[in-house]
């Protein structure tokens, strides 16, 4: 295998440098991009990630990198046999006789497609139109989590514009900063990283926010909530947590996770707890969903 070394200068932890095709790293990246906070591909859990990247016959792995993900077909999935690995240790689980457990993950005993295979293909088709920030997080770029990805997506509106921006331009985006900007610029210089983007584009993945015309697109910088720090708390009926955060950010606001003196107002749903109490203690304005919707549409 490849030698272990720091990924970049200043790193304390050691990583396998064969990042593209190191099966263990690829497995973890695939499981991560399928997770709820990223592309939310329900059928792409840890066991499916193992089957796709580390099948019993390594040469038969349908995923050699993330670039292959949206090109998967039923024909790719059906032959796969895989060992069942423990998510914590990464070691094979054993059956009653002490032998590694092996499963035909994507097919039934009669050879027909298992529901998980059909569901995975449906999920992947749906994932092609996920919000831009989720696509950005799915690329597993160091330091780029959901908060920074939302800000970048709201400001630039397309993956191409994000990667065409200079470090200085990236650093100016709220929540980004110099380290993250450098990480973005370094990531896009790698050939196989660019291949992921081009293959996903060719497969029909939406790499831009429809109607967004460029930096700020007028929406964020001049939006209804421009410069405001807004907190949502409690159970909301009209919005999921993701939807209300998206509405705040795309209109220039900051979707904050905690209440402080800088908070402009709090949107409170049912069973709002400590954040509501904190807002009342600080004299911060509290509104309900209906009022938030009214301000959004005004």
Segments (PLM) and residue ranges:
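Conserved ATP-binding/catalytic motifs of P-loop helicase motor domains
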Residues: 24-27, 39-47, 54, 58, ...
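A glycine-rich phosphate-binding loop feature that marks nucleotide/adenosyl-phosphate handling sites
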Residues: 13-18, 47-54, 68-76, 92-94, ...
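Short acidic (Asp/Glu) and glycine-rich catalytic loops that position anionic groups and cofactors
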Residues: 9-13, 27-31, 46, 163, ...
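Generic low-polarity alpha-helical segments
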Residues: 1-4, 52, 58, 69-70, ...
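DNA strand-break repair and replication-stress modules
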Residues: 33, 52, 60-61, 80-298
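Cys/His-rich short segments
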Residues: 1-41
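Feature of Fe-S/electron-transfer and energy-metabolism proteins
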Residues: 31, 36, 47, 74-78, ...
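Conserved hydrophobic/aromatic packing and binding residues within compact polymer-binding modules
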Residues: 30, 69, 248
């Amino acid at each position: 295998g490849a030698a272990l070394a720091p990924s970049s200068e200043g790193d304390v932890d050691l990583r396998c440098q064969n990042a593209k095709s190191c099966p263990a790293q690829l497995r973890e990246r695939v499981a991560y991009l399928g997770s709820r906070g990223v592309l939310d591909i329900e059928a792409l859990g840890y066991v499916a990630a193992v089957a796709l990247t580390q099948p019993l016959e390594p040469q038969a792995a349908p995923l050699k990198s993330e670039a292959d993900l949206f090109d998967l077909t039923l024909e790719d999935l059906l032959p796969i046999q895989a060992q069942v690995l423990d998510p914590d240790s990464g070691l094979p689980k054993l059956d009653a006789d002490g032998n590694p457990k092996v499963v035909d993950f994507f097919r039934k005993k009669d050879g027909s497609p298992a529901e998980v295979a059909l569901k995975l293909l449906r999920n992947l088709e749906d994932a092609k139109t996920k919000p831009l920030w989720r696509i950005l997080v799915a690329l597993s770029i160091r330091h780029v989590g959901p908060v920074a990805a939302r800000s970048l997506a709201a400001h630039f509106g397309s993956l191409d514009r994000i990667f065409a921006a200079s470090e200085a331009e990236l650093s100016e985006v709220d929540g980004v900063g110099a380290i993250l900007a450098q990480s973005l610029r370094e990531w896009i210089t790698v050939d196989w990283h660019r291949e992921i983007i081009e293959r996903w584009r060719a497969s029909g993945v939406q790499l831009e926010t429809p109607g967004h015309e460029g930096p700020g697109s007028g929406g964020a910088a001049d939006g209804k909530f421009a410069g405001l720090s807004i907190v949502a708390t409690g159970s909301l009926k009209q919005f999921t947590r993701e939807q209300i955060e998206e509405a705040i950010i795309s209109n220039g606001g900051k979707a904050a996770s905690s209440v402080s003196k800088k908070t402009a107002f709090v949107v409170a749903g049912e069973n709002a707890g400590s954040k509501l109490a904190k807002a009342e203690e600080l004299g911060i304005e509290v509104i309900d969903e209906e009022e938030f919707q009214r301000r959004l549409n005004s």
